């Protein structure tokens, strides 16, 4: 994988964490009937998990014990630290915070473990990974933390990396199909936050389940395709290239930004600031104001990470020892 491709994927990671920050900022507008928020929520975490799956190939080749040690330091230690800080500083319920605090890191940790154990099965991963996902769909509590929903995208990301050369031949076709499907989904109001996947959803609303799977997948493919296109068209322009390089640098700190935004956006800004007054028009608030606030706070979180990362204890406890 060349340097250009690494940079463009870091740009994708930047877009993913930007969408997370913007999406969380809509909590400040509880009375706003947002058009943008449900669209963001329909694919932003699938996008994140797909990218994680893409970069998981090396980790999934090491022994389970080594993987457990590595991902415990990188993912579980920040989870424990954030949960303790949240309970102590913000008074959250212990049980609620144990489950919900930085929930995506817990989800990702479990996805790594499941995929690694699956790779021990003496069958092609193209068979075992989908089978393991189907098992997750039907077992009790598989929908906890949306694991059985997001694990699908982790597997897709891994398989994309595994068959990247072959898929490059069809990338324009895949992008075009995804774009058409997502536009249709927008028109039919299918772009909504995914529901918890359990046996009731699978039995009584199978169409809704299939739709939310493909909305998340198509939205992710569109973002990745657009980011690649932007890099190809403008990456060599001096000024634009510097901006893209800056955004790509931010994309390398997504774990830290995700942790920091948990405190700054989720526990402080959106709790104490509520935009209930009709000072601004709903359309301006929805399409411009909140996205600008979320984008600005994403940049703030990035600089908080950069400033605090050199402090060894903070880096270890909150950022997974990021280098």
Question: What is each model feature region?
Answer:
Residues 1-323:
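Alpha-helical transmembrane segments and their immediate juxtamembrane cytosolic regions
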């Amino acid at each position: 994988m060349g340097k250009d491709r690494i940079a463009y994927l870091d740009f994708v990671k930047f877009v993913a964490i930007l969408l997370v920050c913007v999406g969380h900022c809509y909590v400040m507008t509880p009375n706003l009937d947002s058009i943008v928020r449900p669209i963001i929520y329909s694919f932003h975490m699938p996008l994140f998990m797909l990218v994680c799956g893409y970069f998981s190939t090396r980790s999934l080749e090491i022994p389970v014990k080594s993987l457990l040690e590595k991902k415990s330091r990188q993912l579980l230690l920040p989870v424990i630290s954030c949960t303790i800080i949240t309970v102590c500083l913000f008074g959250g319920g212990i049980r609620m915070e144990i489950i919900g605090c930085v929930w995506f890191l817990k989800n990702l940790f479990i996805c790594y473990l499941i995929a690694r154990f699956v790779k021990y099965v003496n069958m092609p991963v193209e068979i075992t990974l989908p089978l393991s996902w189907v098992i997750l769909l039907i077992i009790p509590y598989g929908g906890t933390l949306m694991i059985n929903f997001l694990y699908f995208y982790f597997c897709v990301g891994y398989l994309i990396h595994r068959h990247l050369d072959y898929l490059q031949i069809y990338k324009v076709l895949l992008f075009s199909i995804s774009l058409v499907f997502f536009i249709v989904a927008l028109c039919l109001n299918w772009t909504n936050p995914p529901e918890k996947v359990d046996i009731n959803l699978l039995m009584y609303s199978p169409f809704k389940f299939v739709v939310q799977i493909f909305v998340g997948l198509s939205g992710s493919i569109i973002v990745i395709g657009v980011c690649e296109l932007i890099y190809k068209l403008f990456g060599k322009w001096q000024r634009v290239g510097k901006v893209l390089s800056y955004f790509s640098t931010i994309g390398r700190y997504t774990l830290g930004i995700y942790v920091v935004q948990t405190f700054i956006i989720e526990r402080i800004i959106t709790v104490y600031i509520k935009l209930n007054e009709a000072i601004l028009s709903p359309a301006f608030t929805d399409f411009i104001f909140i996205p600008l606030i979320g984008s600005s706070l994403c940049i703030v979180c990035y600089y908080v990470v950069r400033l605090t990362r050199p402090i060894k204890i903070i880096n270890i406890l909150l950022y997974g020892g990021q280098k």
